[in-house]
Amino acid sequence: MTGSISTSWLLSSPSNSNSASSSESYSFIATLKPVRYYPFQSLTPNRISSRSPLPSIQIRAGIRELRERIDSVKNTQKITEAMRLVAAARVRRAQDAVIKGRPFTETLVEILYSINQSAQLEDIDFPLSIVRPVKRVALVVVTGDKGLCGGFNNAVTKKATLRVQELKQRGIDCVVISVGKKGNAYFSRRDEFDVDKCIEGGGVFPTTKEAQVIADDVFSLFVSEEVDKVELVYTKFVSLVKSDPVIHTLLPLSMKGESCDVKGECVDAIEDEMFRLTSKDGKLAVERTKLEVEKPEISPLMQFEQDPVQILDAMMPLYLNSQILRALQESLASELASRMNAMSNATDNAVELKKNLTMAYNRARQAKITGELLEIVAGAEALRES
């Protein structure tokens, strides 16, 4: 033979070996151009031409492994796309629930503030509106029951953790009421949190029954003076692409606008706000009112025949239930929006990965076919020249 047949000829240029002394007998191997193998193959050239496009992801695998990975990515893409569609359908219902509940909640808060202001002017004390020096705070932390929603649960638990640390630095004890399976798992396995109760969501959408369970626990803690202040930590729904964890003061219902500790220092969170949901052009919007703003005046058209204390006794349970239900609804809407965005990103990543894997698979398959053809032709040429 004029030259030995081996795999090295695929990667190297023709050699000037003395074994082919005759200039007339050309080896087929000497006329072949080097075959370029890409990084996903086991045989890698020292230098690859800059004109040869490389895949965006360097994948090293055989043809069978690539085919299995492509099938796996396709199945994952179907799952993420289905979850995105489900979240998109549910987030619309959750958003509608928040918007439809806004007029009732807003009007109820205005009436309660007006009645409470009237009671304070008459030196009438109501248990849920008494501002005491803050020695202990109850945090109602609302999280989700499921994962696969980006950083939704992590953001609200981090917000609650920072709030607990801030209160402890001021020498104020803190007790946590966790709502949601993810929050329950987070707080229960950490010894630095004093967990009063862990509550799990019961249905697909929040109901007044679920809110009433939380309201009863909050009411008993505040009235028995086990805590001096109650705060809601939940995720505020702003839009389908934005949601922020916030802190909202639930009790006491006071016109003074702030709560102080035994030293007279304000213990309200810096971002503590009263949020009012509004709808503009059929879309959900948020109107913010700082704690320092003037509270609504008593309407001259609003007259009550009953005693203010009797009215507050009858309406405060409704107030607690409505505020907690609103927090649950906003948290659910934020969770669904976050899951929809996360699944959308996962679907896009799956499409891109499938594209890269398919390209690598086609190149590996083409290289294998080309190599087999070259071996057949080279073997035939060697037999002809022998």
Curated annotation (Swiss-Prot):
Induction context: By light.
Active site, per annotation = C149
Disulfide bond annotation, renumbered to this chain: C260-C266
The record's section on InterPro entries has: ATP_synth_F1_ATPase_gsu (IPR035968), ATP_synth_F1_gsu (IPR000131), ATP_synth_F1_gsu_CS (IPR023632)
Cellular location(s): Plastid, Chloroplast thylakoid membrane
Which stretches of sequence are listed as region Disordered?
Answer: 1-22
Protein's membrane topology: Peripheral membrane protein
Nucleotidyltransferase: present as a keyword of the record?
A: no
Q: What residues does the transit peptide encompass?
A: 1-60
Q: Which PANTHER family match?
A: ATP SYNTHASE GAMMA CHAIN, ATP SYNTHASE GAMMA CHAIN 2, CHLOROPLASTIC
General function of this protein: Produces ATP from ADP in the presence of a proton gradient across the membrane. The gamma chain is believed to be important in regulating ATPase activity and the flow of protons through the CF(0) complex.
This protein's assembly is summarised as: F-type ATPases have 2 components, CF(1) - the catalytic core - and CF(0) - the membrane proton channel. CF(1) has five subunits: alpha(3), beta(3), gamma(1), delta(1), epsilon(1). CF(0) has four main subunits: a, b, b' and c.
Q: Which family does it belong to?
A: Belongs to the ATPase gamma chain family.
Q: Under what name is this protein listed?
A: ATP synthase gamma chain 2, chloroplastic
